[in-house]
Amino acid sequence: MLNKIRGGMNMSKVIKTAVTEKLGIKYPIFQGGMAWIVNAEMVAAVANAGGLGILPSGTCADAEHLRSELKKIKELTDKPYAVNFTFMPSLANVDYPSYLKVCIEEGVKIIETSGMPAKPPLMEAMKKAGMIVIHKCTTVKHALKAQSIGCDMVVADGCECAGHSGETDIGSIVLTPRCVEELSIPIITAGGIANGKQMAAALMMGADGVYLGTRMLLTKECPVLDKVKDYLAENADETCTSYLLRAFRNTTRLYKSNVVKEALEKEKAGCEFADIAEAVAGVTAKKMFYENGDVENCGVISYGQAGGLIHSVISIQEVMDSMMAECIESLGRFDA
């Protein structure tokens, strides 16, 4: 998986990898499909800026809602994008066969799966439709399973990441090269990535791209309230997150708000999930994201350790261009 750099030492320089070639994107940078946050407009902005935007399907009300989002994306960009399918118990009521049917009808070419891999009927339908399937994994074992069932790429999701990080606490600096050692398909590094220096490190470890969640949350195009984004940019650092729900084998990295601290104390005391369910529910987070902006006292935010590297809210284009420039400069330090 040789990474090639073309052009002069300036912004016209382009890093081409197996990911950019296979997906037809300019930059090997993915935007995480953050539930309750990412919408069609944000996906299109990422695509137009040169990366791969990913739409979370699980937070669409139904298949027709998903169709309307896909139509918006196609109105706003002619560049590649992906749709995320998250297979986990909390989303058991999502009618993914209908969602996949809509994706096929609307010409979606790339699917990201997370949680569990797609079951055989869905996977077979995806491959029959000619879709590229990417699976997000937190262990080498799961990555090998994804490869064995026909996934075309995997996201190696280190425990620095926001949201669901698995139960093994493997950081991206170990998980990425381990996946590179064991797999023959392209690897995308996720978890703790926020700048071009880290992107260069990921490429040096053998990855073919990087995956941004927290960095993309703090962008101008992200639809959550400016009050939320500004608060995080001003107050977050590398110590500002905490695991929650480990007792329920659903470990999730969150911004350490007052709500999370209270829920964590209950969890440590041996509470039932029902005792904290309302506090961590997506509908509660939506109220904070779009109505009151109260980060500390209303709902929870999936937030990664990369928050310590993010100090301002900038445009998606600025994120992409600055990361690429810094990555190329960093790699250039090692030119023979």
Show the residue positions of the predicted features.
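Acidic, glycine-rich active-site loops and adjacent beta-strand->loop/helix elements
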Residues: 87, 159-160, 192-193, 215-216
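Exposed boundary/loop context
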Residues: 1, 17, 25-26, 151, ...
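Conserved active-site-proximal phosphate/metal-binding subdomains
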Residues: 166-188, 194-336
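Active-site entrance/lid segments in N-terminal catalytic domains of soluble metabolic enzymes
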Residues: 11-182
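Short, Lys/Arg-enriched N-terminal segments with co-localized hydrophobic residues
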Residues: 1-10
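Low-complexity, intrinsically disordered/propeptide-like segments
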Residues: 4-5, 103, 125, 206
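Short pre-catalytic strand/loop immediately N-terminal to key active-site residues, enriched for Gly-Thr
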Residues: 30, 189-190
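Intrinsic disorder/low-complexity signal
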Residues: 6-7, 111, 293
